[in-house]
Curated annotation (Swiss-Prot):
The lineage of its organism: Viruses, Duplodnaviria, Heunggongvirae, Peploviricota, Herviviricetes. Keywords: Capsid protein, Host nucleus, Host-virus interaction, Viral genome packaging, Viral penetration into host nucleus, Viral release from host cell, Virion, Virus entry into host cell. This is Capsid vertex component 2. It comes from Infectious laryngotracheitis virus (strain Thorne V882). The keyword Nucleotide-binding does not apply. GO terms for cellular component: host cell; host cell nucleus; viral capsid.
Length: 572
């Protein structure tokens, strides 16, 4: 009945496995019943031996854990690789884009030259010369009386640059050392721009740089934040018209004030500017053309949290004071409460918005009036635009367009550079005359009696009639600096008292250079975001704003303009 200690014991037989013997490692004897030993033995070892199914499940779990760790490591490696893919792709795209852009420019030049070769009299695809008396289409402009009408296709300034570079061919084409200094500074700050401009190891001015620089200057008065039905230039003309009308009695409306269409108002802008200049001269002792900059946003033109600046931000500016005084900018509850106004204006006429009524009368198809007093950034643009037009009026007053074509910046031939150190008319006569220029032999600065002719505002009237009106008709979203990008360049230079040294050039023109660089490297700045572009553009607008205020506040404005124009022509 009892088995001796350590005697081998037969385990229960399995149909699939052979019989085995096992010795129990126990110091005690093993007691079991003789009958049914296999049955009891199987129950005894059931709780101590590891079942095969349990082993299989654990192995599966460990295998899954290993696979999970391997998959996680692979995902981490893939994530690290994917982070470097955009950098390599961007670099590869740039190496492809730069040659393609160069090829496109070359093809454009070849196409332009092919058109020029077909023209016998020298008419060009983008710049056409018409004889006086011909019917003038909508896309024809005229700069000066002794010039010729010029035709453009899509954009006058860009077409003019394209044609000028095509005419020059491999010869030298100059736009003043100021632009050349800007290009040099741009290349010094970023060597990669040289490939974009295709001026590797070359000192010539780049056509692409000039187009980008002009585009940047044209955008100086554009409001990048928000959408509006009316441009700042349209609001400016409406304000000037109402301001001039308010100075005249209803029974004594002078020439230029009784207009029914907007283009007629455009033609008489010089008249409106004279009305404002008369009032400014009357208060010259206390005049300032600056805002309260402590209440303006630091890095942006428009308010960050809405469409309103802090109260009193425009108050110091003489243009704002005159517009408020004549009711051109209507009174708002921010200026005075109705309870305070009731005793002196019971009908609340001062709350009426005359600009809204004018906008609907001139632009009925837009169906939305211009509520100017509710849009502070647009009010600021109007004040800046009027200031820029006052600069233009002072610059062109009694201007002479009949001087030497190479010494007169009103003539296109002035952009074809003279030999280094040559300024004489004898040397200038050796150079070809560009389209739109009048030969020196026909130029005259005297009338039939030999008396000096005072042009006064005649050249400005002609410019608005033959240049601004056609340009506006072609693009009614154009701002003041879009018509006159040179004004922006003049004001950027004019904001500096004296002439900065070459070492300090960058800090005065960094905003313009930064905007040009952003435009040239569009693909590289995709990730910079709209805020960065907005900050750079608004910095340029602030520089122009600062420059125009200083130029209008100097005592001898004409002399200051001449100095700044010399700076632009020869570089700073």
């Amino acid at each position: 009945m009892f088995r001796p200690r350590f005697e081998p014991m037969n385990l229960p037989k399995d149909s699939n496995k052979p019989s085995t013997l096992m010795v129990l490692a126990d110091r005690l004897n093993f007691i079991s019943c003789a009958e049914g030993s296999s049955k009891y033995a199987s129950k005894l070892f059931e709780g101590t031996l590891i079942d095969a199914e349990i082993m299989t499940n654990r192995a599966r779990i460990e295998d899954l854990e290993r696979r999970n760790r391997a998959a996680k490591a692979a995902l981490e490696q893939l994530e690290n690789m994917s982070a470097t893919v955009p950098v390599h792709v961007s670099s590869a795209l740039q190496t492809i884009e730069y040659p393609l852009e160069t090829v496109i420019d070359v093809l454009d030049d070849l196409a332009q030259r092919a058109v020029q070769e077909k023209d016998i009299v020298g008419s060009y695809k983008t710049l056409d010369i018409r004889a006086p008396g011909e019917d003038v289409p909508a896309n024809v402009i005229w700069i000066v009386k002794n010039g010729e009408p010029l035709t453009f296709n899509t954009d006058f300034q860009v077409d003019f640059l394209t044609t000028s570079f095509a005419i020059a061919g491999n010869g030298r084409l100059g736009f003043g050392s100021w632009f050349r200094a800007l290009q040099t500074q741009l290349l010094d700050n970023n060597k990669a721009i040289a490939r974009v401009l295709n001026v590797m190891g070359d000192t010539r001015i780049s056509g692409r740089f000039m187009k980008t620089a002009i585009r940047a200057l044209r955008s100086a008065m554009e409001i990048y934040a928000g959408t509006r039905q009316y441009s700042g230039f349209e609001a400016t003309v409406l304000c000037l018209l109402h301001y001039s009308r308010s100075r005249q009695s209803a029974s004594n409306i002078r020439h230029g004030l009784d207009v029914s269409i907007f283009e007629d108002a455009l033609r008489h802008v010089p008249t409106y500017l004279n009305y404002m200049l008369e009032d400014i001269r009357a208060e010259w002792g206390s005049v300032t053309f600056s805002f309260d900059r402590s209440k303006l946003p630091v890095n942006f033109f428009s308010p960050i949290d809405g469409r309103k600046y802090s109260n009193g931000v425009f108050d110091p500016h003489i243009v704002y004071q005159l517009l408020k005084r004549t009711g051109t900018l209507s009174t708002t509850v921010r200026d005075i409460t109705k309870e305070t106004l009731l005793p002196i204006d019971p009908d609340f006429v001062r709350f009426d918005d005359p600009i809204a009524a004018l906008s609907i009368s001139f632009f009925p198809s837009r169906r939305t009036p211009l509520i100017l007093h509710e849009d502070d950034p647009l009010v600021r643009t109007v004040i800046d635009s009027i200031s820029l037009l006052l600069v233009l009026q002072k610059l062109m007053f009694n201007s002479n367009v009949y001087t030497s074509t190479h010494l007169n910046r009103f003539q296109p031939s002035a952009f074809f550079e003279l030999p280094l150190g040559t300024q004489s008319e004898q040397e200038a006569a050796k150079w070809p005359v560009a389209p739109g220029s009048r030969p020196q032999a026909t130029a005259s600065t005297f009338d039939d009696n030999g008396q000096d002719m005072a042009s006064r505002d005649n050249n400005l009237f002609f410019l608005f009639e033959k240049y601004v009106v056609p340009m506006y008709r072609y693009d009614n979203r154009c701002e003041v600096t879009g018509f006159f990008p040179g004004l922006a360049a003049l004001c950027i230079t004019g904001r500096v008292k004296g002439i900065p040294t070459a070492v300090r050039l960058g800090e005065y023109y960094s905003s313009l250079c930064n905007l040009i660089e952003l435009d040239l490297r569009k693909t590289s700045h995709v990730g910079s975001g709209a805020a960065a572009v907005l900050a750079v553009h608004d910095s340029l607008t602030g520089d122009v704003e600062e420059g125009v205020s200083r130029l209008l506040e100097v005592f001898d404005a004409k002399k200051a303009f001449e100095r700044n124009i010399e700076d632009i022509q020869r570089g700073v």
